[in-house]
Protein backbone atom coordinates (compact mmCIF):
# COMPACT_ATOMS: atom_id res chain seq x y z
CA UNK A 1 0.00 0.00 0.00
CA UNK A 2 1.57 3.32 -1.07
CA UNK A 3 2.42 5.73 1.71
CA UNK A 4 0.88 8.53 -0.37
CA UNK A 5 -2.52 7.43 0.91
CA UNK A 6 -1.63 8.91 4.31
CA UNK A 7 -0.48 12.22 2.85
CA UNK A 8 -3.55 12.43 0.62
CA UNK A 9 -5.97 11.71 3.46
CA UNK A 10 -4.40 14.25 5.79
CA UNK A 11 -4.13 16.94 3.12
CA UNK A 12 -7.70 16.51 1.90
CA UNK A 13 -9.10 16.52 5.41
CA UNK A 14 -7.07 19.60 6.36
CA UNK A 15 -8.15 21.52 3.27
CA UNK A 16 -11.83 20.68 3.70
CA UNK A 17 -11.82 22.07 7.23
CA UNK A 18 -9.80 25.16 6.30
CA UNK A 19 -12.12 25.91 3.37
CA UNK A 20 -15.35 25.25 5.30
CA UNK A 21 -14.45 27.23 8.41
CA UNK A 22 -14.48 30.78 6.96
CA UNK A 23 -17.90 30.00 5.47
CA UNK A 24 -19.37 28.23 8.47
CA UNK A 25 -18.19 30.51 11.31
CA UNK A 26 -20.13 33.59 10.08
CA UNK A 27 -23.17 31.33 9.62
CA UNK A 28 -22.95 30.25 13.28
CA UNK A 29 -22.67 33.91 14.28
CA UNK A 30 -25.81 34.82 12.33
CA UNK A 31 -27.68 32.02 14.09
CA UNK A 32 -26.31 33.37 17.39
CA UNK A 33 -24.92 29.94 18.25
CA UNK A 34 -22.52 31.42 20.78
CA UNK A 35 -20.87 29.67 23.70
CA UNK A 36 -22.22 30.42 27.17
CA UNK A 37 -19.59 30.65 29.89
CA UNK A 38 -20.10 29.26 33.40
CA UNK A 39 -20.07 31.95 36.06
CA UNK A 40 -18.05 29.72 38.39
CA UNK A 41 -15.33 29.28 35.76
CA UNK A 42 -12.13 31.35 35.50
CA UNK A 43 -12.95 35.07 35.12
CA UNK A 44 -10.67 35.27 32.08
CA UNK A 45 -13.14 33.06 30.20
CA UNK A 46 -15.98 35.59 30.41
CA UNK A 47 -14.59 37.46 27.40
CA UNK A 48 -15.08 34.26 25.36
CA UNK A 49 -18.84 34.41 25.85
CA UNK A 50 -20.63 34.47 22.51
CA UNK A 51 -17.80 32.83 20.56
CA UNK A 52 -19.44 30.55 17.94
CA UNK A 53 -19.63 26.92 19.00
CA UNK A 54 -20.60 23.65 17.28
CA UNK A 55 -17.55 23.94 15.02
CA UNK A 56 -17.25 20.19 15.48
CA UNK A 57 -19.68 19.90 12.57
CA UNK A 58 -16.88 20.98 10.23
CA UNK A 59 -14.53 18.44 11.76
CA UNK A 60 -17.07 15.64 11.34
CA UNK A 61 -17.87 16.53 7.72
CA UNK A 62 -14.17 16.55 6.90
CA UNK A 63 -13.47 13.23 8.62
CA UNK A 64 -16.45 11.47 7.03
CA UNK A 65 -15.88 12.78 3.49
CA UNK A 66 -12.14 12.10 3.55
CA UNK A 67 -12.39 8.62 5.08
CA UNK A 68 -15.10 7.43 2.69
CA UNK A 69 -13.42 8.87 -0.41
CA UNK A 70 -9.84 7.75 0.32
CA UNK A 71 -10.69 4.25 1.60
CA UNK A 72 -12.98 3.66 -1.40
CA UNK A 73 -10.48 5.05 -3.92
CA UNK A 74 -7.65 2.87 -2.60
CA UNK A 75 -9.91 -0.16 -1.99
CA UNK A 76 -9.28 -0.43 1.76
CA UNK A 77 -12.87 0.21 2.88
CA UNK A 78 -13.90 -2.45 5.42
CA UNK A 79 -16.37 -3.25 8.18
CA UNK A 80 -14.00 -1.54 10.58
CA UNK A 81 -14.31 1.69 8.58
CA UNK A 82 -18.08 1.63 8.96
CA UNK A 83 -17.79 0.99 12.69
CA UNK A 84 -15.46 3.96 13.11
CA UNK A 85 -17.79 6.21 11.16
CA UNK A 86 -20.81 4.96 13.12
CA UNK A 87 -19.24 5.79 16.47
CA UNK A 88 -17.95 9.16 15.27
CA UNK A 89 -21.32 10.17 13.83
CA UNK A 90 -23.26 8.69 16.76
CA UNK A 91 -21.35 10.55 19.43
CA UNK A 92 -21.24 13.62 17.20
CA UNK A 93 -25.05 13.66 16.97
CA UNK A 94 -25.30 13.24 20.74
CA UNK A 95 -22.93 16.18 21.19
CA UNK A 96 -24.92 18.18 18.64
CA UNK A 97 -28.09 17.70 20.68
CA UNK A 98 -26.20 18.78 23.79
CA UNK A 99 -24.91 21.91 22.04
CA UNK A 100 -28.33 22.75 20.61
CA UNK A 101 -29.89 22.69 24.06
CA UNK A 102 -27.15 25.00 25.32
CA UNK A 103 -27.40 27.60 22.56
CA UNK A 104 -31.12 27.45 21.72
CA UNK A 105 -32.63 26.82 25.15
CA UNK A 106 -29.85 28.79 26.88
CA UNK A 107 -29.32 25.91 29.31
CA UNK A 108 -25.57 25.99 29.85
CA UNK A 109 -25.30 22.38 31.05
CA UNK A 110 -27.08 21.00 27.96
CA UNK A 111 -28.29 17.42 28.28
CA UNK A 112 -28.54 16.10 31.82
CA UNK A 113 -25.83 13.67 32.91
CA UNK A 114 -28.37 10.86 32.83
CA UNK A 115 -29.56 11.67 29.31
CA UNK A 116 -26.01 11.93 28.01
CA UNK A 117 -24.95 8.67 29.67
CA UNK A 118 -27.93 6.77 28.25
CA UNK A 119 -27.13 8.09 24.77
CA UNK A 120 -23.47 7.14 25.09
CA UNK A 121 -24.40 3.70 26.37
CA UNK A 122 -26.84 3.00 23.53
CA UNK A 123 -24.24 3.88 20.90
CA UNK A 124 -21.63 1.72 22.65
CA UNK A 125 -24.00 -1.27 22.89
CA UNK A 126 -24.84 -1.05 19.18
CA UNK A 127 -21.14 -0.80 18.38
CA UNK A 128 -20.33 -3.93 20.38
CA UNK A 129 -23.21 -5.90 18.86
CA UNK A 130 -22.12 -5.07 15.29
CA UNK A 131 -18.46 -5.57 16.24
CA UNK A 132 -19.24 -9.06 17.56
CA UNK A 133 -21.49 -9.97 14.61
CA UNK A 134 -18.80 -8.86 12.17
CA UNK A 135 -16.42 -11.46 13.56
CA UNK A 136 -13.92 -9.14 15.22
CA UNK A 137 -11.79 -10.53 18.04
CA UNK A 138 -12.85 -10.22 21.67
CA UNK A 139 -9.31 -10.90 22.89
CA UNK A 140 -7.52 -8.34 25.03
CA UNK A 141 -3.94 -7.73 23.89
CA UNK A 142 -1.19 -6.89 26.38
CA UNK A 143 0.91 -4.09 24.81
CA UNK A 144 4.55 -4.88 24.14
CA UNK A 145 3.97 -8.64 24.41
CA UNK A 146 2.53 -11.51 22.40
CA UNK A 147 0.00 -12.21 25.16
CA UNK A 148 -3.72 -11.90 24.66
CA UNK A 149 -6.74 -13.17 26.57
CA UNK A 150 -10.11 -13.90 25.00
CA UNK A 151 -12.73 -12.23 27.19
CA UNK A 152 -15.75 -13.34 25.18
CA UNK A 153 -18.88 -11.40 26.09
CA UNK A 154 -17.02 -9.80 29.01
CA UNK A 155 -15.14 -7.85 26.36
CA UNK A 156 -18.37 -5.94 25.89
CA UNK A 157 -18.07 -4.49 29.39
CA UNK A 158 -14.57 -3.23 28.61
CA UNK A 159 -15.75 -1.80 25.31
CA UNK A 160 -18.66 0.04 26.94
CA UNK A 161 -16.32 1.47 29.56
CA UNK A 162 -13.86 2.60 26.90
CA UNK A 163 -16.41 4.31 24.65
CA UNK A 164 -18.36 6.03 27.42
CA UNK A 165 -15.27 6.84 29.46
CA UNK A 166 -13.23 7.88 26.45
CA UNK A 167 -15.85 10.28 25.12
CA UNK A 168 -16.24 11.90 28.54
CA UNK A 169 -12.49 12.13 29.15
CA UNK A 170 -11.86 13.87 25.84
CA UNK A 171 -14.85 16.13 26.44
CA UNK A 172 -13.35 17.27 29.76
CA UNK A 173 -10.13 18.26 27.98
CA UNK A 174 -11.93 20.72 25.71
CA UNK A 175 -11.60 23.74 28.00
CA UNK A 176 -8.93 26.00 26.49
CA UNK A 177 -8.35 27.39 23.01
CA UNK A 178 -6.61 24.75 20.92
CA UNK A 179 -6.08 22.33 23.80
CA UNK A 180 -8.19 19.44 22.55
CA UNK A 181 -7.47 20.00 18.86
CA UNK A 182 -3.73 19.70 19.49
CA UNK A 183 -3.81 16.77 21.90
CA UNK A 184 -6.29 14.91 19.70
CA UNK A 185 -4.07 15.38 16.64
CA UNK A 186 -1.14 13.90 18.57
CA UNK A 187 -3.09 10.92 19.94
CA UNK A 188 -4.71 10.03 16.62
CA UNK A 189 -1.35 10.47 14.92
CA UNK A 190 0.14 7.85 17.23
CA UNK A 191 -2.66 5.40 16.49
CA UNK A 192 -2.24 6.08 12.77
CA UNK A 193 1.37 4.92 13.02
CA UNK A 194 0.38 1.78 14.93
CA UNK A 195 -2.55 0.96 12.63
CA UNK A 196 -0.32 1.33 9.56
CA UNK A 197 2.29 -0.89 11.20
CA UNK A 198 -0.42 -3.56 11.62
CA UNK A 199 -1.55 -3.28 8.01
CA UNK A 200 -4.92 -1.81 9.02
CA UNK A 201 -4.83 0.82 6.31
CA UNK A 202 -8.46 1.87 6.63
CA UNK A 203 -8.00 2.63 10.34
CA UNK A 204 -4.78 4.52 9.57
CA UNK A 205 -6.61 6.57 6.93
CA UNK A 206 -9.37 7.38 9.41
CA UNK A 207 -6.82 8.46 12.01
CA UNK A 208 -4.92 10.78 9.68
CA UNK A 209 -8.24 12.16 8.43
CA UNK A 210 -8.94 13.13 12.03
CA UNK A 211 -5.45 14.63 12.36
CA UNK A 212 -5.94 16.72 9.22
CA UNK A 213 -9.41 17.84 10.27
CA UNK A 214 -8.43 18.96 13.78
CA UNK A 215 -5.26 20.68 12.54
CA UNK A 216 -7.37 22.57 10.02
CA UNK A 217 -9.76 23.46 12.81
CA UNK A 218 -6.84 24.55 14.99
CA UNK A 219 -6.15 27.37 12.53
CA UNK A 220 -9.37 28.97 13.78
CA UNK A 221 -9.43 27.50 17.29
CA UNK A 222 -5.97 28.55 18.47
CA UNK A 223 -5.90 31.39 21.00
CA UNK A 224 -7.78 33.66 20.63
CA UNK A 225 -10.33 31.17 19.29
CA UNK A 226 -12.73 32.28 16.57
CA UNK A 227 -14.80 29.12 17.05
CA UNK A 228 -15.20 26.24 19.51
CA UNK A 229 -15.83 22.63 18.50
CA UNK A 230 -18.43 22.13 21.23
CA UNK A 231 -19.61 18.74 22.41
CA UNK A 232 -20.37 17.96 18.75
CA UNK A 233 -16.64 17.65 18.20
CA UNK A 234 -15.31 16.58 21.59
CA UNK A 235 -17.71 13.68 22.18
CA UNK A 236 -17.17 12.46 18.61
CA UNK A 237 -13.38 12.55 18.96
CA UNK A 238 -13.54 10.77 22.32
CA UNK A 239 -15.73 7.97 21.03
CA UNK A 240 -13.63 7.70 17.87
CA UNK A 241 -10.29 7.26 19.60
CA UNK A 242 -11.76 4.59 21.87
CA UNK A 243 -13.11 2.77 18.81
CA UNK A 244 -9.70 3.02 17.12
CA UNK A 245 -8.09 1.48 20.21
CA UNK A 246 -10.58 -1.40 20.04
CA UNK A 247 -10.10 -2.08 16.32
CA UNK A 248 -6.31 -2.02 16.57
CA UNK A 249 -6.49 -4.30 19.64
CA UNK A 250 -4.47 -1.72 21.57
CA UNK A 251 -7.14 -1.04 24.17
CA UNK A 252 -4.82 -0.82 27.17
CA UNK A 253 -2.41 1.42 25.29
CA UNK A 254 -5.12 4.09 25.16
CA UNK A 255 -4.29 4.90 28.78
CA UNK A 256 -0.77 5.83 27.63
CA UNK A 257 -1.44 7.45 24.25
CA UNK A 258 -4.41 9.31 25.71
CA UNK A 259 -2.46 10.13 28.87
CA UNK A 260 -3.49 13.80 28.87
CA UNK A 261 -7.16 12.81 28.74
CA UNK A 262 -6.63 10.36 31.60
CA UNK A 263 -4.88 12.97 33.74
CA UNK A 264 -7.63 15.51 33.12
CA UNK A 265 -10.27 12.97 34.14
CA UNK A 266 -8.36 11.85 37.23
CA UNK A 267 -8.07 15.48 38.35
CA UNK A 268 -11.87 15.75 38.32
CA UNK A 269 -12.32 12.45 40.17
CA UNK A 270 -9.73 13.40 42.79
CA UNK A 271 -11.26 16.85 43.24
CA UNK A 272 -14.79 15.52 43.74
CA UNK A 273 -13.70 12.65 46.01
CA UNK A 274 -11.53 14.91 48.16
CA UNK A 275 -14.26 17.51 48.61
CA UNK A 276 -16.87 14.90 49.52
CA UNK A 277 -14.62 13.10 52.01
CA UNK A 278 -12.73 16.01 53.58
CA UNK A 279 -14.53 19.16 52.49
CA UNK A 280 -11.27 20.36 50.93
CA UNK A 281 -10.20 20.67 47.31
CA UNK A 282 -6.88 19.35 46.01
CA UNK A 283 -6.84 21.70 43.02
CA UNK A 284 -7.97 25.30 42.73
CA UNK A 285 -10.32 24.10 40.01
CA UNK A 286 -10.75 21.01 37.87
CA UNK A 287 -10.14 19.76 35.22
CA UNK A 288 -6.42 20.28 35.69
CA UNK A 289 -5.98 22.91 32.98
CA UNK A 290 -8.21 25.29 34.96
CA UNK A 291 -6.01 24.79 38.04
CA UNK A 292 -3.02 26.10 36.12
CA UNK A 293 -5.05 29.07 34.89
CA UNK A 294 -5.84 30.07 38.47
CA UNK A 295 -2.20 29.54 39.47
CA UNK A 296 -1.32 32.24 36.96
CA UNK A 297 -0.17 30.42 33.84
CA UNK A 298 -1.18 31.98 30.53
CA UNK A 299 -3.63 30.04 28.41
CA UNK A 300 -1.10 29.54 25.63
CA UNK A 301 1.54 28.27 28.08
CA UNK A 302 -0.87 25.67 29.47
CA UNK A 303 -1.93 24.51 26.02
CA UNK A 304 1.61 24.14 24.67
CA UNK A 305 2.70 22.33 27.85
CA UNK A 306 -0.18 19.87 27.54
CA UNK A 307 0.65 19.35 23.87
CA UNK A 308 4.23 18.53 24.84
CA UNK A 309 3.08 16.09 27.51
CA UNK A 310 0.67 14.53 25.02
CA UNK A 311 3.50 14.10 22.52
CA UNK A 312 5.65 12.35 25.12
CA UNK A 313 2.78 10.00 25.97
CA UNK A 314 2.21 9.26 22.27
CA UNK A 315 5.89 8.49 21.69
CA UNK A 316 5.91 6.25 24.76
CA UNK A 317 2.86 4.38 23.47
CA UNK A 318 4.49 3.75 20.09
CA UNK A 319 7.71 2.67 21.78
CA UNK A 320 5.90 0.17 24.05
CA UNK A 321 4.08 -1.49 21.16
CA UNK A 322 6.70 -1.40 18.42
CA UNK A 323 10.09 -1.65 20.10
CA UNK A 324 9.66 -3.41 23.44
From Swiss-Prot:
Biological pathway: Cell wall biogenesis; peptidoglycan biosynthesis
Sorted UniProt keywords: Cell cycle, Cell division, Cell membrane, Cell shape, Cell wall biogenesis/degradation, Magnesium, Membrane, Metal-binding, Peptidoglycan synthesis, Transferase, Transmembrane, Transmembrane helix
Reactions this protein catalyses: UDP-N-acetyl-alpha-D-muramoyl-L-alanyl-gamma-D-glutamyl-meso-2,6-diaminopimeloyl-D-alanyl-D-alanine + di-trans,octa-cis-undecaprenyl phosphate = di-trans,octa-cis-undecaprenyl diphospho-N-acetyl-alpha-D-muramoyl-L-alanyl-D-glutamyl-meso-2,6-diaminopimeloyl-D-alanyl-D-alanine + UMP
GO biological process: cell division; cell wall organization; peptidoglycan biosynthetic process; regulation of cell shape
Listed CDD domains: GT_MraY
Entry keyword annotation includes Cytoplasm: no
EC id: 2.7.8.13
InterPro entries with a match to the protein in the record: Glycosyl_transferase_4, PNAcMuramoyl-5peptid_Trfase, PNAcMuramoyl-5peptid_Trfase_CS
Transmembrane spans: 5-25, 52-72, 76-96, 117-137, 147-167, 176-196, 203-223, 227-247, 250-270, 302-322
UniProt-annotated location(s): Cell membrane
Topology in membrane: Multi-pass membrane protein
Function: Catalyzes the initial step of the lipid cycle reactions in the biosynthesis of the cell wall peptidoglycan: transfers peptidoglycan precursor phospho-MurNAc-pentapeptide from UDP-MurNAc-pentapeptide onto the lipid carrier undecaprenyl phosphate, yielding undecaprenyl-pyrophosphoryl-MurNAc-pentapeptide, known as lipid I.
Similarity annotation: Belongs to the glycosyltransferase 4 family. MraY subfamily.
Name the record gives this protein: Phospho-N-acetylmuramoyl-pentapeptide-transferase
Phylogenetic placement of the source organism: Bacteria, Bacillati, Bacillota, Bacilli, Bacillales
Amino acid sequence: MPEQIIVIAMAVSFLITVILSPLFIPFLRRLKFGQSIREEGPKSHQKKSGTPTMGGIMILLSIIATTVWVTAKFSVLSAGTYLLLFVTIGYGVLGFLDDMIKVVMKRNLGLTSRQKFIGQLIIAVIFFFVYRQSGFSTALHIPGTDWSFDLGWAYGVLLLFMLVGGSNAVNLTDGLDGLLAGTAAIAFGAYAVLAWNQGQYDVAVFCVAVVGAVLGFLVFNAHPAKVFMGDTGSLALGGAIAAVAVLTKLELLLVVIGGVFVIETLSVIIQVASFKMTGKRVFRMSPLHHHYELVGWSEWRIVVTFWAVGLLFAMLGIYIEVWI
